[in-house]
Amino acid sequence: MTDEQIKELFDTVPAFADSCIESLRPAPFLRSISRCLSASVNTGLIYGTVNPNYPGMTWRELLDKGEKMRKNIRLFTVNPEYYLNLERFRAPFMSFCFHEGKGYVAEDGCHRACIAKFFLYSQPSPFLCGVHFTEVQTDARMTNLFYRLKKLLPVWCAAFPNSQEVTRNDDAKEWSMSFYRNTLRIENHHRKGFNADFQAEELEEGLLPALLNPFKRRFGMYRNLLN
């Protein structure tokens, strides 16, 4: 879609128009997940989508070539107020997931989210109201340890992340929050039955030093797991 066509629809060409749409990559370790059935999201913080068809495209290209875009643009030209209203629940519903501050279109609403980004860019407020909202906080400490260990472990050992929900607050009618406990499972494929689950402290103070020290690796307390 040309600059002139975008200006005709939205009065301006936003700075993000030629930025690539990002894909949502699931985090190996979670700290918490909060969910809200009716929230407002800043469309300026929407960077991508879980839809596998669009990452790598620019927002301009999605506006031009999206599967349902012509229909949604036609509806927008008839009723732009749809993107400005303060309805408690937007219909059809739209769903967004935020990972560490970056937003992604989740289950539904990719084409409308694209239109909202362009339209609300020049409006007094960039917020889209009445949408489903999920916010994910990840465990950066365990994630960093996981990727370090993958480089250091012998080829016959494998590392598997595990995030287990330990508490959930879902007493409220329209929102809930879950908290997670994280461990890293190491399995030795040469020795059946030799595996172990580690929390961050033992990884930092025990397993990593053993992997970095040839003597500890061969004769230390983790010798059956690592050899």
Which residues make up each language-model segment?
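Short alpha-helix boundary/capping and kink motifs at helix termini
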Residues: 1-103
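Charged/polar, solvent-exposed surface patches and flexible loops
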Residues: 75, 118, 151
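A short, basic-hydrophobic beta/loop patch
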Residues: 88-148
